[in-house]
Amino acid sequence: MISCIPDERTIRTALSLASRAPSFHDAQPWLWRVASDSLHLYADTDRRGPDTDVESRGVLLSCGASLHHCVAALAALGWRTKVQWLPDAAEPEHLAALELYPHPASALDVMLASAIPRPT
C-alpha cells in the first residue's frame, strides 16, 4: 500500500489537536512538516528551557505527547499511521516520519480523539 496525504482540512485538524499536547513549561517544542506523502515531527530545541532542560528530556517528552495526539486525531479522521522513529541519524531533531493510509475510524478512535481538546 502506498502512503498518501489527506486533504488540507484533515491535516490542519490533526495538527491542531497535536498542538494541544501538554509540554514542558508550555513551550510546545515541536515542529510539524508536511511532505508530499508523509508528515514529519521535529524537535525544536531552541524552545527548551536552557537552565531547566539541559538534556532536552522535556522536549522529547513533549514531542512524544504531540505525536500521540496527532496519531489519535488521524485515526479518528480515518487515517492509519505507520511511524518511523528517528528516520535520519544525521539529523537528530527529526524525531519521526509518519506514513498515512486511509482506514475506517472505529468508535474507540473517535472517543480517544474527542478527549484531546478537553482542558485538564
Give short role names for the model-derived ranges.
Residues 1-120:
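Acidic, surface-exposed loops and disordered segments
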